[in-house]
Every structure is written in structure tokens, then in C-alpha cells.
Curated annotation (Swiss-Prot):
Subunit structure: Part of the 50S ribosomal subunit; part of the 5S rRNA/L5/L18/L25 subcomplex. Contacts the 5S rRNA and the P site tRNA. Forms a bridge to the 30S subunit in the 70S ribosome.
GO molecular function, one term: rRNA binding
Function recorded in the entry: This is one of the proteins that bind and probably mediate the attachment of the 5S RNA into the large ribosomal subunit, where it forms part of the central protuberance. In the 70S ribosome it contacts protein S13 of the 30S subunit (bridge B1b), connecting the 2 subunits; this bridge is implicated in subunit movement. Contacts the P site tRNA; the 5S rRNA and some of its associated proteins might help stabilize positioning of ribosome-bound tRNAs.
Gene assigned in the entry: rplE
UniProt xrefs under PROSITE patterns: RIBOSOMAL_L5
Gene3D superfamilies per record: 3.30.1440.10
The name this protein goes by in its record: Large ribosomal subunit protein uL5
Keyword DNA-binding: no
Length: 180
């Protein structure tokens, strides 16, 4: 079964983008390549349980087992050594990516208090969009009683778009609630 958002992309978004930017070839049309969700767990250096609960939260949210990220080098100010576990991340592609994006845009973000839309300034110049989330409770799968600590995460949308404008239009047509 094709995810709802992928169907919308194929039937509505591609024609809309071709009309707006005048692509000659269907392969030129930008598409979502992957979504990376990263959770930095600074407390993991003292308490291994924190990392385990972050990993379980992230696997529930993403529907896929995350990998534990380790420190690349030692930093005395942060009291971390090389190869110390300091967070976890998960990379979603294809079906899971579309399902997660659909859930994020239509269920999770509208549940945030005082939500007025996401910033349209968080593009990196190469057509990728980053979004910071303050708490994992906005996802319906996370049970409020089982949460030991409110954790934020970074969500990065990697697209094949060449420019920020193309990527913004792609995400807007897919249903990303931009503020302006």
C-alpha cells in the first residue's frame, strides 16, 4: 500500500512543481530523499538509562531502531571522551519516511501548544530543511506516564532540490505548516 503523502506527491505535488518552476524532465522535480531524526542526550555520560529511554522513545516515534551516536573526539569542557555514547539518530527513507512526514505535519505539530507554524528560515542553502522540536510528547505514540524526562530532537528533511526556494515549495505542497 502506498503511503498517503507519497500518493499526494505523485498526483498533486509533481504537477504543481512542474507548473511553478517549468521543469523539462520529470526527474528534475525535487523530492524528499530522507528524514534524519537526531536526539542528543548529554546526560548519557553520567546515566546510561537516559540513553536507553531516548533510544526507546525514538524507536517508537520513528518505527525503526535508532543507532547510538558516539563522541568524535574528547572535549574536557563537556566532560566527554572519544567514543562515549552521547545520543541517538535514525534515518528514514521511502515508505517510513513518507509515513513519518505525514504524521509529523498532520498530527504531531498541530498538537504543540501555541503553534503558529514552523520557521521558513531554517533552510541550509542546498535545499535541506532542519526543524527543532522541544518535546517528544507531541507524538501520539509516546505515553505521558512513561516519560522520564522531556527531550527535544532535531528533524532534518533532505531533499533533492537545488535551491531553498524549490525545497520550500516542495515541503509547502506536501503540507508543511510554514508560518508565513
Amino acid at each position: 500500500m502506498v503511503p498517503r503523502l507519497q500518493e499526494k506527491y505523485e498526483k498533486e505535488v509533481i504537477p504543481a512543481l512542474i507548473e511553478k518552476f517549468g521543469y523539462k524532465n520529470i526527474m528534475e522535480v525535487p523530492k524528499l530523499e530522507k528524514i534524519v531524526i537526531n536526539m542528543g542526550v548529554g546526560e548519557a555520560k553520567e546515566n546510561q538509562k537516559m540513553l536507553e529511554s531516548a533510544v526507546s522513545d525514538l524507536s517508537i516515534i520513528a518505527g525503526q531502531k535508532p543507532i547510538v551516536t558516539k563522541a568524535k573526539k574528547s572535549v574536557a569542557n563537556f566532560k566527554i571522551r572519544e567514543n562515549m555514547p552521547i545520543g541517538c539518530k535514525v534515518t528514514l527513507r521511502k515508505v517510513k519516511m513518507y509515513e513519518f512526514a505525514d504524521k509529523l505535519m498532520n498530527v504531531a505539530l498541530p498538537r504543540v501548544r501555541d503553534f503558529r507554524g514552523v520557521s521558513s528560515k531554517s533552510f541550509d542553502g542546498r535545499g535541506n530543511y532542519s526543524l527543532g522540536v522541544k518535546e517528544q510528547l507531541m507524538f501520539p505514540e509516546i505515553e505521558y506516564d512513561k516519560v522520564d524526562k522531556v527531550r527535544g530532537m532535531d528533524i532534518i528533511f533532505v531533499t533533492t532540490a537545488k535551491t531553498d526556494e524549490e525545497a520550500r515549495e516542495l515541503l509547502r505542497f506536501l503540507g508543511m505548516p510554514f508560518a508565513h
